[in-house]
Amino acid sequence: ALRVGVTAPFMLVKLLKPYFNEGASIVNISSSRDAMSQAQSESYTAAKGGIHALTHALAISLAGIARVNSISPGWIETTDKKYDGPDALQHPVKRVGRCEDIAEMILFLCSEKAGFITGENIKIDGGMSKLMIYHDEDGWKYQ
């Protein structure tokens, strides 16, 4: 996972650097798993965290040459299978992400509108990583 997830993007940037045009933008794809884990997912989580770290390091190394950002998607529907019911309802936005949600952010980050954004990792997960999960706990009630 580390060779593909971290070494490959690093080597590609090194190889392609002479060909970057003015205003170049690099968008790496990480995962919301860069900050969350499940048992037996150490290699994947480390690779995704590595992409996040590589992104901010490259943003400094390539300053004035290219802007470098990353996106960390959460659950994204990538097939004809639709996630609904509990899968969708557990997200604060009440749906699972779509490929278009990621594509639109990539287009934005590559545009001049994002000209002052570099070194950032943008999590696109419908708020899932912000949701605290406690069973039988409704939080604090304002009275």
Which stretches of residues belong to each language-model region?
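Residue(s) in the substrate-gating loop at a strand-loop-helix junction
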Residues: 31
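A glycine/serine/threonine-rich, flexible loop-to-helix segment
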Residues: 63, 70-92, 96, 131-143
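Active-site loop immediately N-terminal to the catalytic Tyr-X3-Lys motif
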Residues: 23, 36-42, 94, 112
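C-terminal helical subdomain
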Residues: 7, 11, 70, 85-117, ...
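Alpha-helical segment proximal to the catalytic Tyr-Lys
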Residues: 18, 60-64, 115
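Catalytic Tyr-X3-Lys loop
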Residues: 1-10, 27, 51, 93
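Short C-terminal tail/terminal secondary-structure segment
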Residues: 36, 107, 118-143
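Active-site helix of classical SDR
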Residues: 13, 47, 55
